From Swiss-Prot:
GO terms for molecular function: 1-deoxy-D-xylulose-5-phosphate synthase activity; magnesium ion binding; thiamine pyrophosphate binding. PANTHER family: 1-D-DEOXYXYLULOSE 5-PHOSPHATE SYNTHASE-RELATED, 1-DEOXY-D-XYLULOSE-5-PHOSPHATE SYNTHASE, CHLOROPLASTIC. Keywords: Isoprene biosynthesis, Magnesium, Metal-binding, Thiamine biosynthesis, Thiamine pyrophosphate, Transferase. The keyword Magnesium applies. It holds the Pfam family DXP_synthase_N. The gene is dxs. This is 1-deoxy-D-xylulose-5-phosphate synthase. GO terms for cellular component: cytosol. Homodimer. Pathway: Metabolic intermediate biosynthesis; 1-deoxy-D-xylulose 5-phosphate biosynthesis; 1-deoxy-D-xylulose 5-phosphate from D-glyceraldehyde 3-phosphate and pyruvate: step 1/1. Catalyzes the acyloin condensation reaction between C atoms 2 and 3 of pyruvate and glyceraldehyde 3-phosphate to yield 1-deoxy-D-xylulose-5-phosphate (DXP).
Length: 619
């Protein structure tokens, strides 16, 4: 939709229709709502002043970019938002040329803009300029300031729209958020600042010194001091819902041909009164009734996250040494109740995964029992800290890895399929996984008192595949596997975490063909060498199930063990392929990639038949 030349009234009508479309689709499909509604006028302003087919439009996280999608030829397709093979909930270049870069994790936008600006400068292009939209929540991460530090020195022309709604996902945390929220009306100060700068240019040296001191004192009460000290131009705060003011400011910033930060104050959930209230509830939502705001499906009260939360709360009440941290996801990781109950022992440190891990390393050194509750996809942001600050000193930090496996509608930037591979590489790391809710309780208890080094346990977003009561649960024993079913054929199913449930369901489907054995590894590091050796004498063909990538995964660990001890077994991975997994409902995605029970059963059957055929050829 071309917004150039449209009147202010027409642009306001466009904004209204965009909000209506977003509400219509998100109430049906689910998605990121409040941040999206709050950014509508800012995005309309961007499209009215800049050209997304030419200027790199870079959205931090990009969950707030729905209006951008609607303005760039995806109005009808938007009905498929976050559905399998439909419109992504984030910017995606393969979906549209107007989506400059893929996003999903926070605080990358300014670095991308600096890189784009360098390319524009090297190409000697005069008519292109990066435009960034970043929320105040993302400004709590250090990557932003690494980029701003270089930008202030290099002075690449760009416009950075800082969307300040005094909210990230949860309650804003830290000095940066407090600094932004204290911003005062900026026009008066912009006017005074301009007059002071003109005065400085005409005063003799002695008087100029006094005027310069006056300017420095003025900065103490203006909201832009932080950015100006970094060498950037600052405009604001402006009303992020006033299109006239937004467009005028964007035009001024564009004409300055410098790095300019526009500080816009907005209201999350703008235009939908119900969503203008509670902070976290309306960030990411499932389908809901538009008139009442009530979810169409009640959330499960016994999700793995809830089980983890309740178990850790019980342990924290019993043991004052139990502490914990989350990075801007207290509700999503289940730490909200603990932050509320024990505010001096559980912390939300904002979008700062590196800081979260390193700070817990120090607590572990001081004799505390720190839990880092974090999504699998976000833990990778702190990989160096896990190695350097936790691993080398063998500190007993406990990593509770939520969303392990396929997470669904958020797509490739959020799938939790790499953690087994990247954690298994770390010396002295213990890596385990529960198979059920009851097993998860035991995992949390085991991790609490584990003292040999760092320990991690992973669990899925949705319910475990394995139903409760199928197998009796017992406490975890360090490095010990558990034999669950004995088979009469030479086929053994090896499960890890949620893979145990998948293996069990496949065994039922194939019961008429094979009577298989089933073992729950429980630990992929260290492996239970004794039990594995015993199993190698009973079963020739091992099929390995886990909810993670096969590269560096559980089967890889078993193949390393096989090579080390010389076990005469065939190890076949039923894990996820070495690919990024697209968005869609978990059930649809699993069916498409052959990771549901039907697909896995067929894969097992084909692999075993291939082995049988090859043996016949050798006879």
């Amino acid at each position: 939709m071309n917004l150039k030349g449209k009147t202010l009234k027409e642009l306001e009508e466009v904004s209204l229709s965009i909000r209506e479309r977003i509400l219509e689709v998100v109430s049906h499909n689910g998605g990121h709502l409040s941040s999206t509604l709050g950014a509508v006028e800012l995005i309309v302003g961007m499209h009215a002043v800049f050209d997304s087919s030419r200027d790199p439009f870079i959205f931090d996280v990009s969950h707030q970019a729905y209006a951008h999608k609607l303005l760039t030829g995806r109005w009808e397709e938007f009905a498929t938002l976050r559905q399998f093979e439909g419109v992504s909930g984030f910017t995606k270049p393969s979906e549209s040329e107007h989506d400059y870069f893929i996003a999903g994790h926070s605080s990358t936008s300014i670095s991308l803009a600096v890189g784009a600006a360098k390319a524009i400068s090297l190409s000697l292009e005069k008519n292109r300029m990066p435009v960034v939209l970043i929320g105040d929540g993302s400004m709590s991460a250090g990557l932003c300031y690494e980029a701003l530090n270089e930008l202030g020195d290099r002075k690449y022309p760009m416009v950075i729209l800082l969307n300040d709604n005094e909210m990230s996902i949860a309650e804003p945390i830290g000095a940066i958020s407090k600094y932004l929220s204290q911003a005062i009306a900026g026009r008066f100060f912009q006017s005074i600042k301009g007059k002071v700068e003109k005065l400085l240019a005409h005063l003799p040296e002695g008087a100029s010194y006094m005027a310069k001191r006056f300017e420095e004192s003025l900065k103490l009460i203006t909201p832009g001091i932080l950015f100006e000290e970094l060498g950037l131009e600052y405009i604001g705060p402006i009303d992020g819902h006033n299109l006239k003011e937004i467009i005028e400011t964007l035009r001024i910033a564009k004409a300055m041909n410098k790095p300019v930060i526009i500080h816009a104050q907005t209201l999350k959930g703008k235009g939908y009164k119900i969503a203008e209230g509670p902070r976290e509830h309306w960030h990411g939502v499932g389908p809901f009734d538009l008139s009442s705001g009530e979810p169409l499906k009640k959330p499960c009260s016994s999700s793995p996250t809830d089980i983890f939360s309740r178990t850790l709360l019980e342990l924290a009440k019993e043991d004052e040494k139990v502490v914990g941290v989350t990075a801007a996801m207290p509700s999503g990781t289940g730490l909200s109740a603990l932050v509320h109950e024990f505010p001096n022992r559980f912390w939300d440190v904002a979008i700062a995964e590196q800081h979260a891990v390193t700070s817990m390393a120090a607590l572990a050194k001081e004799g505390y029992k720190p839990f880092v509750a974090i999504y699998s996809t976000f833990l990778q942001r702190a990989y160096d800290q896990i190695i350097h600050d936790v691993g080398i000193m063998k500190l007993p930090v406990k990593f509770a890895i939520d969303r392990g496996g396929i997470v669904g509608e958020d797509g490739e930037t959020h799938q939790g399929i790499l953690d087994i591979g990247y954690l298994r590489l770390i010396p002295h790391m213990t890596l385990m996984a529960p198979r059920s809710n009851e097993s998860l309780k035991e995992a949390v208890k085991f991790a609490k008192d584990f003292s040999l080094g760092p320990i991690a346990f992973r669990y899925p977003r949705k319910s475990f595949v394995l139903q409760e009561g199928i197998f009796s649960e017992s406490p975890f024993l360090y490095g010990k596997a558990e034999r669950l079913m004995e088979g009469k054929d030479e086929v053994l199913f090896v499960g890890f975490g949620n893979g145990v449930g998948r293996a069990y369901e496949v065994s039922k489907v194939m019961a008429s063909e094979y009577e298989v054995g089933l073992v729950d590894l429980r630990f992929v590091k260290p492996l239970d060498h004794e039990t594995l050796w015993e199993l190698s004498k009973e079963y020739r063909y091992w099929l390995v199930f886990s909810d993670a990538s096969k590269v560096g995964g559980v089967a890889s660990a078993l193949l390393e063990w096989k090579a080390e001890v010389g076990a005469e077994v065939e190890i076949l991975s039923m894990e996820l392929e070495d690919e990024y997994i697209q968005h869609g409902k978990v059930e649809q995605v699993e069916e498409e990639i052959g990771f549901d029970v039907k697909g896995l059963s067929q894969k097992v059957r084909e692999r075993l038949e291939r082995i049988a055929n090859s043996q016949r050829l050798l006879v």
